Structure formats: structure tokens, C-alpha cells
Amino acid sequence: MNKSAQQKSAHVTTRRLLDMKHNGEKISMLTAYDYTMARILDRAGLDVLLVGDSASNVFAGHSTTLPITIEEMVYHAKAVVRGVHDESGRAMVVVDMPFMSYQISGDEALRNAGKIMKEHGCDALKLEGGKIIADTVKRITDVGIPVMGHLGLMPQSIYKYGSYKVRAKEGVEAEQLLEDAKIIEEAGAFAIVLEKIPSVLAAEVTRSLTIPTIGIGAGVACDGQVLVINDILGLNREFHPRFVRQYADLNTVIEHAAKQYVEDVRQSNFPSPDESY
């Protein structure tokens, strides 16, 4: 075995995530949208990298996830997959299917799922929705494409909700979410993201399923957690939701570095003789 191969870690698979749930090991997941960040996060030991349609917000500046296209998702996914491959190769890469790429018909959903998988070599896809997309999930998983579900607050349905408030706080909606989770599991999903739901409900869903749950604003009882990388790094001063823990203030760090650069250029302090040819 060559040195490069020795440095590669065992790649995280759907089977590994299932084993982690059964062994009580928590699953760590963050979003990634580019090559450099993917390498850093894979090196840091993340189990899963999500190429989220949240790129529409944090990368392109849109107010919702709806505008991003399949072609744009493929662009980001290719970069992330290359990053993981060029680092340890350990992290699983999951890609969001964007709005209206799987809702029109089962045939179109299957065609788009195949397109996304073939064009960048990711490990799995993520779809939002409950029983209304169960047949689609089954069709996609039946051809061998792993699917991660997403329930609770579903950003692709933001205009239906009218806000980003906590979902399933009332009895009827909570019961429906629990039912949807079981239906999506039966349809073949290997895991389900639970977003902004009461922690008590998330715990109940987690206990009721044999597949892992990944929480975002859903409490500590979930089998794992996911956050947007920009949020934990403090890159957006205007966005401070309750469920995000900020681990760094890169907004300030980057701004300070840029200001220093501007000053050095204006004062002819950069480049120095050592930085010139």
C-alpha cells in the first residue's frame, strides 16, 4: 500500500451511520459548498458534509433556497467531492435536490437524481417532505441511490409556512410529522433531518425509527446534528438564530485582515522586497 492510500480513512457509508445510531455514537454534519472548505472539514473529522441548497442563501445571497438550480448544485457538489477525495476521503457527501427537481413527477425526480449522482459522484441525496414524496423516495432508493429525508421546517416550503418559526408544536402537526417520519423510513431513506421542531418530539421520532435522525434546532436527543458552516464560523453578523452555536468570529477576522491589506497597499508597505521577484 502506498503512502497516499495509507493516509486515507475509512469512508463513511449509510451502513456506518446506522451502526453509529445503534452504538450510541453521535453523527456530526456540516454544510460545505467549495473545495477548500470541504478539505478542511474532512480533515477535522466530520462524518457527513451536506452540499445544501442553503448555498442559495449564504453563497449567492438569495433570501430563500428556491432559486438555486440543479446545475448550480452540481457545480458546488463537484467541488466538495473533489475536496473530500483530495483530503482523507472519509466524509460522506450528501447533496440537496433543489426545489422543483423532484416534485413534478416520479420520472423527472428519478432522472434528476441520476443526473446529480452521475455528474459529481456524491454518496447520497436529500429530499424534503413526508408522505407526499414517499413514492418518489422509494423509486429513487429502488435504483440504488441513497436518500436522506427532511421533515419539520422545510425551507423549500417557506412560502407555504410564511415564516421560519418552529414547526409541529401542536398535536395534529406533531402526529403528522411522526407518521411522515415512519413513512419516509419505510420508503427506503437511510436517515432523516429534523429541523426546528420541539426537542421532545424529536426525541420521540428518534426512538421510533431504526434509521438515524440528524437535528438542526431539534434538541440533543437526535442521533446527530447539522448546522450551516457559515453560521458556526460567524460569517453573517445579521443571522443569530437560537439553535446556532457560534464557534468563531471570522467576519471580524476577515474584515480586519482585509483592512490591514488595504492599508499596506496604500502605504506601499506591500509587497516588501522579500515578497517581490
UniProtKB/Swiss-Prot annotation:
EC number: 2.1.2.11
Keyword Iron-sulfur found: no
Pathway annotation from the record: Cofactor biosynthesis; (R)-pantothenate biosynthesis; (R)-pantoate from 3-methyl-2-oxobutanoate: step 1/2
Zinc in keyword set: no
Class of this enzyme: transferase
Pfam family, one: Pantoate_transf
Subcellular location field: Cytoplasm
Superkingdom as given in the UniProt entry: Bacteria
InterPro entries with a match to the protein in the record: Pantoate_hydroxy_MeTrfase, Pyrv/PenolPyrv_kinase-like_dom, Pyrv_kinase-like_dom_sf
Keywords annotated in UniProt: Cytoplasm, Magnesium, Metal-binding, Pantothenate biosynthesis, Transferase
Positions that bind Mg(2+): 53, 96, 128
Sample GO molecular function, one term: magnesium ion binding
Catalytic activity reported: 3-methyl-2-oxobutanoate + (6R)-5,10-methylene-5,6,7,8-tetrahydrofolate + H2O = 2-dehydropantoate + (6S)-5,6,7,8-tetrahydrofolate
Active site as annotated: 195 (proton acceptor)
GO biological process, one term: pantothenate biosynthetic process
GO cellular component terms listed in the entry, alphabetical order: cytoplasm
Record-listed 3-methyl-2-oxobutanoate binding positions: 53-54, 96, 126
Assembly and oligomerization: Homodecamer; pentamer of dimers.
Its job: Catalyzes the reversible reaction in which hydroxymethyl group from 5,10-methylenetetrahydrofolate is transferred onto alpha-ketoisovalerate to form ketopantoate.
UniProt family annotation: Belongs to the PanB family.
Name of the protein in question: 3-methyl-2-oxobutanoate hydroxymethyltransferase
Species assigned in the record: Pelodictyon phaeoclathratiforme (strain DSM 5477 / BU-1)
Phylogenetic lineage: Bacteria, Pseudomonadati, Chlorobiota, Chlorobiia, Chlorobiales
Gene that this polypeptide is encoded by: panB
